[in-house]
Curated annotation (Swiss-Prot):
It is found in: Cell membrane. Residues 1-28, 76-139, 192-278, 341-512 are cytoplasmic. It comes from the Bacteria. It catalyses: D-mannitol(out) + N(pros)-phospho-L-histidyl-[protein] = D-mannitol 1-phosphate(in) + L-histidyl-[protein]. Residues 51-54, 162-170, 299-318 are extracellular. Residues 17-349 form the PTS EIIC type-2 domain. It comes from Staphylococcus aureus (strain MSSA476). This is PTS system mannitol-specific EIICB component. The gene is mtlA. The active site is at 425 (phosphocysteine intermediate). It is an enzyme of class 2 (transferase).
Length: 512
């Protein structure tokens, strides 16, 4: 394996790990928001104080949300059975530390117990006497839950207490030393590299929940989610940009600022690497502003949209929220404008920067790809890469795996029994949802009413999936998750000629 291929493999594994972390948190964002509303509205200093309803906030953050996260983590590993036992075992960690929201503990216990349940079943089921299946299944799950609950109480809880203490001390040290803005030096570049979800949902959300439970709000929820720095970059392109970058920056600004999809501005930074300075300084400004005003959110601001910021702003602190976003955008804009005004034009264009970003992320970005496709209606197919070596294993070589499944030849498959199409992406909430919505509209216009179109995360693809549509960089993972399904690869979810090819094939099979 060449060094380049090895780096790509490592990148895929890192991206998969980051996706797994965010897949535990993102499906439960609704619960976070519900808890945030209850805390923001009904507590003593809320919008409508109510002592009775305020009592809901504590149990929700202490029990409900950690259990949901543990269930999600266990289910990702071993479906419903893994999720149930994972949630059961996580009670040990929660009860051991009732004053600390055990989100980090749940993120560890959930996948671990799900994996142990899977291995336990693999060991016991082949040795189970006929007629005793239910007995063995129930007792094996119960015994594992019993053991892991005690392990969580006696082993993981003290470990979590130590880890949370170290992390809390580090964050508090930065706060007291007025150095918290320096975190942006790492956070802003890491977002653009591919770690935005892993950072926000894997680090700041658990720590922020602990702070919010103790202090009522947390500044940590604002560090990665502030839409100001990205808006400043896009505003600079609107005024000082040229060509495709300028033309697409207006739509990108709306998607980023109001929709909260931050990845839309990543290619604009990659086009001019000096713009990393702009987003870092913008991020530092936002954090410094919120630190100076004592601002924070009661729950995660996800997605990082200005609308979400407005809805989550605590009573009496709306102006503080506006100030943090405005100053972050202003500093980012001024620095970006100076860079664009007084430096040479970049050698690479928006298309190349988008490709660079996608290569770095280890996957296609349908939102970023729309930047390129919206400026021109020509959609060119990728040229076939070189012949795959006969000695390559399709499991190790994604290109060979895609060739074996004919993922780019829509006409090569039989669609007679298809009644469900699934769009799958990393987290199952953003780009795949847009792709599914687009195909549903196409089906509706074509009179195809007997086929359901849904979206999900790759890790949550059902084993009985019939037809799965993914972006090319993710198709190999989807195939390994559902090897018996038909798989179609697209360059981006928002503009692919394969949708029309699929429609034509479905119509033919329906008429036949």
């Amino acid at each position: 394996m060449s060094q380049t291929e090895e780096k790509k493999g490592i990148g895929r594994r890192v991206q998969a790990f980051g996706s797994f972390l965010s897949s535990m948190i993102m499906p439960n964002i609704g619960a976070f928001i519900a808890w945030g509303f209850i805390a923001a509205i009904f507590i003593d200093n809320g919008w409508l104080p109510n002592k009775d309803l305020a009592t809901l906030a504590g149990p929700m953050i202490t029990y409900l949300i950690p259990l949901l996260i543990a269930f999600s983590g266990g289910r990702l590993i071993y479906d419903l059975r893994g999720g149930i036992i994972a949630a059961t075992a996580t009670m040990g960690v929660i009860v051991a530390l009732p004053d600390t929201p055990m989100l980090l503990g749940a993120m560890i216990m959930g996948p671990l117990v799900g994996w142990l349940m899977k291995k336990t079943d693999q060991l016991i089921q082949p040795r189970t006497p006929q007629g005793f299946e239910m007995l063995f299944n129930n007792f094996s799950a119960g015994i594992l839950g019993f053991i892991m609950t005690i392990a969580g109480f006696k082993i993981l809880a003290p470990l979590m207490k130590f880890i949370m203490h170290i992390l809390s001390v580090a964050v508090e040290a930065l706060v007291h030393a007025h150095l918290l803005p320096l975190v942006s030096i790492l956070v802003e570049p890491a977002k653009i590299v591919f770690l935005n979800n892993a950072i926000n949902h894997g680090v700041f959300t658990p720590l922020g929940a602990d702070q919010a439970a103790k202090a009522g709000q947390s500044i940590l929820y604002t560090i990665e989610s502030n839409p100001g720095p990205g808006l400043g970059i896009l505003l600079a392109y609107m005024i000082f940009g040229k060509g495709t970058a300028k033309a697409t920056s207006y739509g990108a600004g709306i998607i980023h600022f109001l929709g909260g999809i931050h990845e839309i501005y990543f290619p604009y930074v990659l086009m001019r690497p000096l713009l990393f300075i702009a987003v870092i300084l913008g991020g530092m400004t936002g954090v410094a502003t919120y630190q100076a005003t004592g601002f924070g959110f009661k729950s995660p601001a996800s997605p990082g949209s200005f609308i979400v910021y407005c809805l989550n702003a605590p009573r009496g602190e709306f102006l503080h929220m506006l100030l943090g976003v405005f100053l972050a955008a202003l500093v980012s804009f001024v620095v970006a404008a100076l860079i664009m005004k007084f430096t040479r034009e970049p050698k690479q264009d928006l298309e190349a920067a988008t490709a660079q970003m996608e290569n770095t992320k280890g996957k296609k970005s349908s939102v970023a790809s729309k930047l390129v496709s919206s400026d021109k209606n020509v959609n060119t197919e990728e040229n076939a890469s070189g012949n795959v070596s006969e000695t390559s294993s399709s499991d190790d070589d994604p290109e060979a795996l895609l060739d074996n499944y004919n993922t780019e030849d829509v006409d090569a498959h039989n669609y007679n029994n298809i009644n469900h199409v699934i769009f799958a992406c990393d987290a199952g909430m953003g780009s795949s949802a847009m792709g599914a919505s687009m195909l549903r509209n196409k089906f509706k216009k074509a009179g195809i009413n007997d086929i359901t179109v849904t979206n999900t995360a790759i890790n949550q693809l059902p084993k009985d999936a019939q037809l799965v549509i993914t972006q090319k960089k993710l198709t190999d993972r989807a195939i390994k998750q559902t090897p018996n399904a038909i798989h179609i690869s697209v360059d981006n979810f928002l503009n692919s000629p394969r949708y029309e090819e699929l429609l034509n094939n479905l119509k033919k099979d329906d008429q036949a």
